[in-house]
From Swiss-Prot:
Enzyme Commission number(s) of this protein: 2.8.1.1
Protein name per the record: Thiosulfate sulfurtransferase GlpE
Similarity section: Belongs to the GlpE family.
Native organism taxonomy: Bacteria, Pseudomonadati, Pseudomonadota, Gammaproteobacteria, Enterobacterales
UniProt GO cellular component terms: cytoplasm
Pfam families: Rhodanese (PF00581)
Gene Ontology molecular function terms on file: thiosulfate-cyanide sulfurtransferase activity
Cytoplasm keyword on record: yes
């Protein structure tokens, strides 16, 4: 994959529950703590190294932000780091929370 692909929250939910991809949330710590997808890894500048050690470049990665804009830059960055398949989630956490209100966790 030379460029990231934009996917819907429904597609992301399906990939996540099939084990076909991991989910990262790039929002600020306060927003993440107030609510995030339960399986989301909070990806920040400080946690990037740990994420990359834990997940090889053959891992498909889905990036979630607030509304689906910032995730595009982060998705491109992950591709440049060597990840084979990266997705940006359209609508971000706002769309996830609207579509899957029962699938939201709180806390860091």
């Amino acid at each position: 994959m030379e460029q990231f692909e934009c996917i819907t929250v429904e597609e992301a939910y399906q990939k996540l529950h099939q084990g076909a991809a991991v989910l990262v949330d790039i929002r600020d710590p306060q927003s993440y703590a107030m609510g995030h997808a339960p399986q989301a890894f909070h990806l920040t500048n400080d946690t990037l190294g740990a994420f990359m050690r834990e997940h090889g470049f053959d891992t498909a990665v889905m990036v979630m932000c607030y509304h689906g804009n910032s995730s595009k830059g982060a998705a491109q960055y992950l591709l440049q780091q060597g990840y084979d398949a990266v997705y940006s989630i359209d609508g971000g956490f706002e769309a996830w929370h609207r579509r899957f209100p029962a699938d939201v966790a709180n806390g860091a």
